[in-house]
Amino acid sequence: MLFRCIKAEKKKLAHSMIFPACIVIPIIPAIMGTFNYLQNTAILTKQWYSLWTQITLFYSNFFYAPLIALYCSYLWRLEHRNHNWNVFLSTPVTIPCLYLGKLAVIFFVTLITQIWVGILYIIAGKLAGLPGICPPQILFWLLRGTFAAISIGALQLLLSMIIRSFSVPIGIALVGSIFGMLISSSGYGLMLAGMNSNRNTDSLAGDNLTFLVSTFIFFLLFYLIANQVLKKRDV
């Protein structure tokens, strides 16, 4: 049943603006970060690592979570129109599968976004005249940060499910990103730590298990809440 739900959710993305958004929007932080790097090469001397700190300074703090929120708001958009909630909750599929189907599609689109960010980073590095190739460690940081989409997506799906507005959950994600940046400065921002945002050394210092466990705990929390909300929702 879960695969049927995933297939149905993917059909909603056909001919939508989601994929153009996941291609165009990451270009903005890539340009901003590269420009910032080129203006400060006298103090940013770690080359590929320094470029990474500048691109992720903008991308992780201001674009990553709002992009996921955008994807989530779009997937709930049809349910919030007319009487589509009746159709959604009347389908012969379990509540967990309905929610997890959406989350799986969100993770898939986020993965595409992250791959594109990696490509933009490599292109930016070459345009900036950096020698050699991108350090493999940085690509690992990018992949590790992708797993944060599981918990972020679970929360944003919950918010977009409850809030009918398309833009409000995205605004909440932006505010949360800024708040998370402040928390990160105190050493507790595991999402940003996962992607190693604005760092040229591994901020987790190899403690990947803590990051993965915290991601799973937050996912489980938001999933259980969403599951209860859906069960109590009137058809």
Feature locations, PLM:
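Aromatic- and glycine-rich beta-strand/loop motifs that create alpha-glucan
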Residues: 1-26
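Generic transmembrane alpha-helix motif of multi-pass integral membrane proteins
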Residues: 9, 13, 89, 151-167, ...
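Membrane-helix interface segments
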Residues: 17-18, 82, 94-96, 100, ...
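Pore- or pathway-lining transmembrane helices of multi-pass membrane proteins that form conduits
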Residues: 21-26, 163-181
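Secretory targeting signals
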Residues: 25-68, 73, 100-163, 202-208, ...
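Terminal transmembrane helical anchor/hairpin motif
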Residues: 32-52, 170-235
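Helix-loop-helix units of permease transmembrane domains in multi-pass membrane transporters
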Residues: 75-107
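Transmembrane helix-loop junction
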Residues: 78, 91, 122-126, 161, ...
